[in-house]
Design a protein with these regions (language model features):
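Short beta-strand segments
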Residues: 78-79, 104-108, 161-167, 239-240, ...
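Conserved beta-strand elements of the Class I
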Residues: 25, 76, 236-239, 284, ...
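A glycine-rich helix N-cap at a beta->alpha junction
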Residues: 46-55, 97-108, 187-194, 441-454, ...
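Flexible, low-complexity linker and terminal segments
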Residues: 1-13, 17-19, 136-351, 356-357, ...
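Short helix/loop capping segments that flank catalytic or ligand/cofactor-binding pockets
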Residues: 87, 114-116, 170-173, 246-250, ...
Length: 530
């Protein structure tokens, strides 16, 4: 078939569609969002009734995908790296249950934290779950891995983890597609107890997983994504993982003088590793992320061979890998031709003009400064996190999805008053509801501001699970309806908003304020599409 110019994310999505996908499950998060959006917009999705709705969070996405696999269908789960923390309960246990229909989990990592709280490396999740992993070096490999990965998942009976990174997810390349496969029919496991993880059966299933490890290593040794290329200069051997191989080849367009082991599939291929180790004086590990392979090699080799990489300072311990850092690591002259002109100023993200979060912060901060000058506000993950910046300087925390409510409760437990949390509507239904339940169960003196812009705005305006139902959810959890207050955050309503904020902050119990106004960007898109 002819080539298409695709983002790395789009290559994954197209491969899944071509491989007979029956459902994609995801919660939006950069740099993974475009995978699901591409599937949602593809004509074949409607034609073949491929499930494609956003989930409340990554845990529900992982569980629903496992359910799709349970009935023999092929499923894709997509999330950013910190979403793996949310999905981990089901993800780790799915390695023990195994799968029926092919199941691929995409974890899009964000080295350098372009839009994330940390730069954790998802390969560690695959490693301690004992399942096979893919790590593509380019868009074509991303496509090929997913296309064949469903069949591989069904063959070995396990979910497959695929790790992407921001630069690969959000850059384009020509991708050659393969033939379209039909969706699987409904089938069930021959073992009726496969998915029942009672301790007695879980122990049996775990032994099955352990028995598959040699098969996984053999698959890695025979994989087209793990390739050993010899070189004349044996002073150095290079292990290049994922996009690190791409950066290495940018420095050696005519071929590398050193032996190179390209890694695209895990567990590590022992046969090729021995070949590299036995012929080279020292080893350099290139990986875009934490020293996952480097640590394994140090333990694998003992003290016999020197291993260089992030741990010894050859490469920086934080931030992205790039062609320049690879050039320095192999002792090549840095020939970068482009610098950043001094006239180009930093333009940090800011709340949009006309955004309802602005009006919420202005009124909330005015009230708190007047009544409680030493106040603290606990916030969360979303556009409103930008309230940390000038001119608002309105919040004191941003840790993880849903943490605003439970951190405010913990602070209230410790004697802080007022304890104020700010959270968005999508983040509230993702991970905030259980925190609110804790507050209700203990009648904590907490004021929770659910700033409702009726969408998941920061990642591009995806559907929010609680749209139009936030008040009902709060009441259902047990918040007194008299202390669930809805306001429209507009300048003309400032005095009304400030009065409501004063009343609810002074209330000794659980109170919820919902400033509701549609995201200004979503509204603009709707008007343009008319």
């Amino acid at each position: 078939m002819s080539k298409q110019l695709l983002l790395g994310d789009e290559a994954i999505a197209q491969a899944a569609l071509d491989a007979g996908l029956s459902g994609v499950y995801a919660y939006p998060g950069t740099p993974s969002t475009e995978i699901t959006e591409y599937i949602q917009m593809a004509p074949i999705t409607t034609e073949q009734n491929i499930h494609n709705r956003w989930c409340a969070n990554e845990k529900t996405a992982m569980e629903a995908a496992l359910g799709m696999s349970f009935v023999g269908k092929r499923a894709l789960v997509c999330m950013k790296h910190v979403g793996m923390n949310v999905a981990a309960d089901c993800f780790v246990n799915s390695a023990i249950t195994g799968v029926k229909g092919g199941l691929i989990v995409i974890a899009a990592d964000d080295p350098s934290m372009h839009s994330s709280q940390n730069e954790q490396d998802s390969r560690f999740y695959g490693d301690f779950s004992l399942i096979p992993m893919y790590e593509p070096s380019n868009q074509q490999e991303a496509y090929d891995m997913v296309y064949s990965g469903f069949e591989f998942s069904e063959k070995v009976g396990e979910p497959i983890l695929m790790r992407m990174v921001t630069r690969l997810a959000h850059s384009r390349s020509g991708v050659e597609r393969k033939e379209q496969k039909p969706q699987n029919s409904i089938t069930f496991s021959e073992d009726p107890r496969q998915f029942i993880l009672l301790p007695g059966n879980a122990r049996k299933r775990y032994k099955v997983l352990l028995a598959r490890q040699d098969e996984f290593i053999k698959a890695s040794e025979e994989s087209p994504y793990n390739k050993y290329t010899d070189g004349p200069n044996k002073k150095l051997g290079i292990v290049a993982c994922g996009i690190g191989y791409n950066y290495l080849m940018e420095n050696y367009p005519e071929g590398c003088e050193y032996p190179v082991l390209k890694i695209g599939q895990y567990p590590l291929p022992k046969k090729q590793l021995h070949q590299l180790i036995e012929s080279c004086d020292e080893i350099l590990v290139l990986e875009d992320g934490q020293p996952f392979v480097e640590k394994q090699l140090k333990g694998y080799l003992g003290i016999g061979v020197k291993v260089k990489g992030r741990l010894d300072g050859t490469l920086s311990q934080d931030g992205e890998l790039n062609p320049d850092s690879v050039a320095r690591a192999v002792g090549k002259e840095n020939k970068s031709e482009f610098g950043i002109p001094s006239v180009v100023e930093m333009r940090p993200p800011a709340l949009c003009e006309g955004c309802g979060h602005r009006d919420m912060y202005i009124t909330l901060t005015e009230v708190l400064k007047e009544e409680y000058p030493s106040h603290k506000v606990f916030s969360d993950i979303g556009c409103y996190t930008l309230g940390a910046n000038a001119p608002f300087n309105a919040i004191n925390s941003c840790v993880d999805m849903g943490a605003s409510i439970t951190m405010a409760k913990g602070a209230a437990d410790g004697g802080l008053f007022p304890a104020v949390a700010v959270i968005g509507d999508s983040t509230f239904t993702h991970s905030g509801m259980t925190g609110l339940l804790d507050c209700v169960n203990e009648n904590a003196s907490v004021t929770i501001v659910i700033s409702d812009n009726e969408t998941t705005a920061m990642t591009g305006g995806q559907d929010s699970a609680g749209t139009g139902r936030i008040e009902a959810i709060c009441a259902g959890i047990g918040v007194d309806p008299a202390h669930i207050r809805v306001v429209t955050p507009l300048k003309k309503n400032y005095e009304e908003m400030k009065q409501i904020i004063r009343e609810e902050i002074e209330y000794r119990g659980v109170s919820v304020i919902i400033p509701r106004r549609e995201c200004i960007q979503t509204l603009a898109r709707k008007k343009r599409s008319k």
